[in-house]
Amino acid sequence: MSAQPISDFYAYPDAAGHFGKFGGRFVAETLIGPLQELSAAYDQARQDPSFIAEYDKDLKHYVGRPSPIYHAERLSREVGGAQILLKREDLNHTGAHKINNTIGQALLASRMGKTRIIAETGAGQHGVASATVAARLGLECVVYMGATDIERQKINVYRMKLLGATVIPVTSGSATLKDALNEAMRDWVTNVRDTFYIIGTVAGPDPYPRMVRDFNAIVGREAREQMLQDYGRLPDAISACVGGGSNAIGLFHAFLNDPGVKIYGAEAAGDGIATGRHAASIAAGRPGVLHGNRTYVICDDDGQITETHSISAGLDYPGVGPEHSFLSDSGRAVYQGITDDEAMAAFHLLAHTEGILAALESSHAVAQSIKLARELPRDALVLCNLSGRGDKDVHTIAAREGIAL
């Protein structure tokens, strides 16, 4: 916890990209120049009304924003306690929140004169969103994806290929998201002249954590306005799943300076934190450096990154965005582990009560929201970010339950 309370969370990051003691730019010298170029281009673009107007236009007419807030009445009655509200990011074009960020970064890539974009992906949603915007803007697209994730997300792999992207399997390490990110970084260093790296989460070296946050902040801005318009007040609590944490910070950011709104992040506890087979970086990790920033990471006593586990490919990452580490240490947000079994139970309950198939990532937040609702009175409001739809996970769920498709 911070020694002094934070009076304005919007003062972060500082000019060097630090969120308190987290964040920064811990990279090889060969990347300093490209990152400085990117930072300058982004700072210029975000002050340009024509860039903002183009981004807003695409969010409305291409992505389909605003996404609605849906009152899950039957789920709320089944659970008992508070009313559960869902911010429906699953209804966006491509089926998740990821498109909010890829649209922004792809427009920036075009503005910078880049002709090739690369991306890393875990669950495949960021890869699909990157391939989608590349096709729309006429850019070459290469997606790095861990071989383990390719096996459990075959549908999204094929979707990327249908959109014209090249998908490169990564077999090093645990062959999951962190390894895909490593390979994408190597590609960027080699091809920086014509290549733009679209990072899919609020991790990486500055300016990525703030840039990805800013492009996803539309989620929270909309939600805040919708809550005041439809319910006349802000929610009592908000919840979102946290791997790297882009959907979560997108929701959280608009509420950071509202002390009456409690903020909760749902991390992947996998088989249970005590088993060691999890991906709960804040709940069970320690500060370290990963992928160019200082944050909470899952590592051994020597500081070496260890393998993680989650039924959800998108949460199977041994780190977390530095702003989340900062929010945790400051006490502004609470991060809790949700097991595979709890996420699965929430997936089925939401499907049966509301007719909505949530992504396994999002199901962690649904499970957390259910727990929160049971502890609150019936007139309390819990807003859950339903960050993506579950079509991509049907084969994983069926296999886990012994059903052959």
UniProtKB/Swiss-Prot annotation:
EC number: 4.2.1.20
Modification type N6-(pyridoxal phosphate)lysine: residues: 98
Catalytic activity annotation: (1S,2R)-1-C-(indol-3-yl)glycerol 3-phosphate + L-serine = D-glyceraldehyde 3-phosphate + L-tryptophan + H2O
Keywords: Amino-acid biosynthesis, Aromatic amino acid biosynthesis, Lyase, Pyridoxal phosphate, Tryptophan biosynthesis
InterPro entries xrefs: Trp_synth_b_CS, Trp_synth_beta, Trp_synth_beta/beta-like, TrpB-like_PALP, TrpB-like_PALP_sf
CDD domains cross-referenced by the UniProt entry: Trp-synth_B
Any one GO MF annotation of this record: tryptophan synthase activity
Pathway it works in: Amino-acid biosynthesis; L-tryptophan biosynthesis; L-tryptophan from chorismate: step 5/5
Cofactor: pyridoxal 5'-phosphate
TM region(s), chain numbering: none
GO cellular component: cytoplasm
Family in the record: Belongs to the TrpB family.
Classification via NCBIfam families: trpB (TIGR00263)
Functional summary from the UniProt entry: The beta subunit is responsible for the synthesis of L-tryptophan from indole and L-serine.
Subunit text: Tetramer of two alpha and two beta chains.
Name of the protein in its database record: Tryptophan synthase beta chain
Organism of this sequence: Xanthomonas euvesicatoria pv. vesicatoria (strain 85-10)
